[in-house]
């Protein structure tokens, strides 16, 4: 995750907490990293989101980074709910939510009804279908899920061990300092 994205962590945390998805800060940072690397005035690339009601609904229409983050967090929340994500490590459902963030609100119900969830193959199929329907050369990023997940530390096991995932989940707990997880894992923090 770039320094430019890290600068936005306090705002990401603020809006994630405000919209009830405080445990997904790392996922939101990974999305921002893929969308913009933290660059520009629309770092979440959320101008075309249904949550943008103040700026033009065109690429880079939002010119206020904080508003972009607020809209992006709401869009991610909507995708997490639509995909029925249960936790920050519910990777099958997170993949569905991420592709939905990139493709818009039609993908999640289509993938669930047609295939029972996300696959790379159905992401390609949906993109091709939508591009054809709209008369466009392409539609979205067919590889969006792997592109985002390369930045998501909870989505992989660093250095071949599972300990880091557990520690990061514990650290992400707001309000209790992760104490229940630290005790569960054998630390007397």
Predicted regions span which residues?
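Surface-exposed patches in mature extracellular/periplasmic domains of secreted proteins
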Residues: 22-29, 83-99, 178-187
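Short, surface-exposed glycine/acidic/tryptophan-bearing loops
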Residues: 39-59, 65, 116-121, 180-189
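Short, functionally critical alpha-helical segments immediately adjacent to catalytic or ligand/cofactor-binding
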Residues: 22-39, 46, 69-73, 97-103, ...
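Non-catalytic cell-wall polysaccharide-engagement segments
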Residues: 1-5, 55-70, 74, 78-167
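N-terminal capping segments
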Residues: 157-189
